[in-house]
């Protein structure tokens, strides 16, 4: 029991350090990229271990590398901190029920990684200008667009048009609706029968969009506002039901 507690404390401490040491290099609102990367989507991921080291590992574990090398693919890339957050919440759950925690990514069943990673992959190439407007507070008017992910999951993709807010000479706030910067969103639909109602979708904003490669495009998700898998409860249930691989 003492060994079990020490292992968990070491893991939680290490994970906390990793999360706190994340730098701005993790694609924090860096805008739209026009240059074409000389390589495939998978090549780009492999060549950015500073951002996508854990992501590269779970791609290998899930067997999806060939999919990201195929012609015509769009990948909403979750940064490593998003993956660490999902593992942290899984380990909190395991610790609460007296189970040993996950120390390495390969302790989660590969089918779980494949199921949830497939939510971020789309056949064909979609850049920001291809996607309709999304207003998460007014989806009846600006709903974005429904998409089916590579894994068959109902998802929504849209572009949020931010407002321009300023003050006039009298100090009164002035708002110009939808005149600000545009930001791409990938959203998980919780309730397909009631899209647009409060709490019906979970949004993942994109920090850096339109990273073009020789076979497709990457949109890097904003790690501070996203946890891998969108729903921590779903990810935890899947990982637990498939069985943690203890070594």
How does the language model describe each region?
Residues 1-10:
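Bacterial N-terminal signal peptides that target proteins for export
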Residues 12-15:
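Hydrophobic alpha-helical membrane-embedded or membrane-associated segments
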Residues 17-21:
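C-terminal motif of bacterial Sec signal peptides marking the signal peptidase cleavage site
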Residues 22-247:
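Mature, structured domains of secreted/extracytosolic soluble proteins
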